[in-house]
UniProtKB/Swiss-Prot annotation:
Keywords: Cytoplasm, FAD, Flavoprotein, NAD, Oxidoreductase
Source organism: Salmonella typhimurium (strain LT2 / SGSC1412 / ATCC 700720)
Pathway noted in the entry: Nitrogen metabolism; nitric oxide reduction
EC number: 1.18.1.-
Gene responsible for this protein: norW
Named cofactor requirement(s): FAD
InterPro entries tied to this protein: FAD-bd_OxRdtase, FAD/NAD-bd_sf, FAD/NAD-binding_dom, NO_rdtase_NorW, Rbx-bd
Protein name: Nitric oxide reductase FlRd-NAD(+) reductase
Length: 377
């Protein structure tokens, strides 16, 4: 008798995988195990909850029971997996164990919190659970410090500013989105945030946080300090690899998988934010959707290597939205930038004259798909 497929996790990657499996096989036993409630919500919405006055419960799209019934699966919410015996094909919690034929790790990623004095005062917004734990504090806060000027930090800074809060955005780098694009490209967003009233502290490093009668004192390495009501860490995500390590599966930055989404153990796979696919961590929706399509085939006996096309990444900053694609982080590209009142097109060209990356904003975003077709990958 088939022991079926076990998926650890209940986020976007896990749900996409379930849907793709059920498109091909209505009967293979499916089991979902996760530490949270398993209710569905749209994680990107967390970047806009404050300006839209949304509570954590407002984000719920589908209850876990409805999903389980719709897709014919067993579910074990609020369950912490303690160990995986890869040789015996057994997943263990403190009081239960499950046997599997194939196991999928969809354990996601956790928000990195800088290891500074007072780090316990920092909030993170990487899940509905995390938002639920701090929504009252964030709603009441008037002065907000966001640590990290990447995608999430920039999105949150705009959202809190649109909600009428006093926002300070801090980053070690000299420009926003520094790991994604050069400053001459990100400067349009940077200037817009400043015009909105966001106070930028670039080339700045946080040293410590202290609770005071007035709120929280944030002290920089430079000894400059500011008083705020809330501090949010937006300093990146770390793939959740602890279970994979305990199972004896190869791990680097994420859980190492090949083009078949297979780990170093032939019956264990990984997908989503926890996975490192041929050396790349790709925590974006489109690669996860494609991964789910291919992995479903492979779990059901197929042999389909994942092929990822050039893909758009969307920066969800509504007053100055951006789309980017290609190797925008490459330092050897020559950037050709056309900036007008209705938007910007920035093209990253190689020494051979090939289009290797681009960033478009505002009304020029409609040109993104045409540019994608000419992108060299």
């Amino acid at each position: 008798m088939s022991r079926g497929i076990i998926i650890i996790g209940s986020g976007f990657a896990a749900r996409q995988l379930v849907k793709n499996i059920r498109k091909q096989d209505a009967h293979v036993p499916l089991t979902l195990i996760a530490a949270d409630s398993m209710d569905e919500y749209n994680k990107p919405d967390l970047s806009h909850v404050i300006s839209q006055s949304q509570r954590a419960d407002d984000l719920t799209r589908q209850l876990a029971g409805e999903f389980a019934e719709q897709f014919n699966l067993r579910r074990f919410p609020h369950t912490w997996v303690a160990d995986i015996d890869a040789d015996a094909h057994v997943v263990k919690s403190q009081d239960k164990q499950w046997q599997y034929d194939k196991l999928v790790l969809a354990t996601g990623a956790t928000a990195f919190v800088p290891p500074i004095a007072g780090r316990e005062l920092m909030l993170t917004l990487n899940s509905q659970q995390e938002y639920r734990a701090c929504e009252t504090q964030l709603r009441d806060a008037q002065r907000v410090l966001i640590v990290g000027g990447g995608l999430i930090g920039s999105e949150l800074a705009m959202d809190f500013c649109r909600a009428g809060k006093t926002v300070t955005l801090m980053d070690n780098a000299a420009s926003l989105l520094a790991s994604l694009m050069p400053p001459e490209v990100s400067s349009r967003l940077q200037h817009h945030l400043t015009d909105m009233g966001v106070h930028l502290l670039l080339k700045s490093q946080l040293q410590k946080l202290e609770k005071t009668e007035a709120g929280i004192r944030a002290t920089l390495v430079s000894q400059h300090s500011i008083e705020v009501d809330a501090v949010i860490a937006a300093t990146g995500l770390r793939p959740e690899t602890a279970l994979a390590r305990r199972a004896g599966v190869a791990v680097n930055r994420g859980v190492c998988v090949d083009s078949y989404l297979q780990t170093s153990h032939p019956d264990i796979y990984a997908i989503g934010d926890c996975a490192e696919i041929n050396g790349q961590v790709l925590p974006f929706l489109q690669p996860i959707q494609l991964s789910a399509m291919y992995l479903a085939k492979n779990l059901l006996g197929g042999n389909a290597p994942l092929k990822l096309p050039a893909m758009l990444v969307k920066v969800k900053t509504p007053e100055l939205p951006l789309h980017l694609a290609g190797e925008t982080q490459r330092r050897d590209l020559s950037w050709h930038i056309t900036a007008e009142s209705d938007g910007m097109i920035a093209k990253g060209m190689s020494g051979e004259g090939q289009l290797r990356a681009f960033v478009v904003s505002e009304d020029r975003m409609k040109e993104a798909f045409a540019l994608l077709k000419t992108l060299s990958v």
